[in-house]
Each structure stands twice: as structure tokens, then as C-alpha cells.
């Protein structure tokens, strides 16, 4: 660089070009497409047949086996009726995002300025998830025969939201012979609410949590300002000074209402401990 000496290299940004005001803009559209081709999951009939052949519905105690066989027949009726839920696609979407870049510059041989702004909106493949980023900057420079002033201001903003539909692995574990809604079209909170049959807890429907007022967001703001001055009263003497300011703030906001399925096992003395913030 122009200031390199004794093994020190100083990198400076490109100065705005002098002359008339110049404006430029670029934009693009982005797609986030889920790829499920690597997932080979069983359909409802295959899953039920695997459970039967593995002895899942067998029990040495006659009264237990009768109940299990009854449950098997209930599920088989659902399968024969055409129930075959492909859970992997339920929380997914094709995310459509966009990016924009704007630049403004101008000035004269003594005073030059430029301003830039970039906005990027990324829509995730999980429903209602996103990440939005804004970067802006203003560069100013002023030159005389003896003085040079430069100021660079940059601002970065970011906001992200996780999907209220939970995590994708929750849907991979769901049985295809379960239905997402009841006979009235309402999203189920639990599947087959048979506590004894499932051995301890109700299997929950992660789609139900998306109907609640859940929240999981984060954001941050970065601001940087660098000022430099160069004074050269004579050819053999140069005085340089720099001053910089940097600040960052960040926040997270996570809320789960008491009705969230993660608190389904909170009973008796823990009932009023449901919910988190």
C-alpha cells in the first residue's frame, strides 16, 4: 500500500471517484429448496408390518396381548382406510428470499463521498424461519494541500427467527399411520392418547406447537466508526492520527407457552411450572 514501510502494510478502501453523482443497484432472488431424496422411510403399511413381525404387539400375559392386538387392528383399519402421512414434508417449504445492493457516490477533487447499503432476506426451508441482514456504510474524505480527513461508518443489523414447527428430526420419528388432524380438521396435540400402551408419555404432534404463540428470535447490531487524519505541513514531515469506535448489542427472545407439548409430562406439583421465557 501507499503507507507500507519497514514490513508494515496498510490496506485502505477504494476512494469514491470524483465527478458527477453515480448510483447503482443490483438485486437477486434466492430459493431455498428442501432435498428429501436421501430419506427412504417406510410407509404406513410397511411400518405396521415391521412392528407386527418384530413382536411389538405380542405379550406373554394374555390380557396384555389382547389389548395390543386390539390396538394393532385399530391401526390396521386406519391404514386400510388410506392413512399414510408423509411427515417429512409437513414442516418444510420452498424458501423465497431476496438480496439488494445499492451504492451512491460522488464529489469533487477535494471532497468525496459514498454510501452503500445491502439487504439480504433468507427464508429457511423450515416454515416461518428466516434470517435478515442489513449492512450499510458511509465513506467521507476531504483533502487539501496539507490535510486529509477520512471517516468510515459501517452499520450491521441482523435478525433471525427459528421455526415454530420445531426441529426436522421430530418429524422423522413420527409414525406414518398417524394423522395430523382429528375428524373435525383440528390439529391434534397428541397421537393415540393411550398412556399404558405407549409406556410412559403421550406421543406429541409437533405441528400443534406451531398453532401456539411460541417465539424464538435473536438479533444483533454492530456499529463501527473509523476516523483518520493526515497532516503534511512540509514534504519531509507527516503526522497521522486515527480514532475508532465499535459497539455491539445482541438480544435473544425465547418463549414457550404452558400448552407446549414439551410440558406434557408436567403434572401434579409441577403443573404450574409449565411454560418458559
Predicted regions and their residues:
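A beta-strand signature from Gram-negative outer-membrane beta-barrel systems
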Residues: 1-24, 97-99, 112, 118-120
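Membrane-embedded beta-strand positions in outer-membrane beta-barrel channels/transporters
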Residues: 8-10, 99-101, 135-137, 224-226, ...
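Surface-exposed loop/interface segments of Gram-negative outer-membrane beta-barrel transport/assembly proteins
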Residues: 17-83, 124-129, 135-224, 240-277
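Outer-membrane beta-barrel channels and translocator barrels
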Residues: 18, 97, 108-109, 143-147, ...
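Outer-membrane beta-barrel initiation region
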Residues: 90-94, 104-108
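An active-site-proximal structural segment forming one wall of the substrate-binding cleft
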Residues: 237
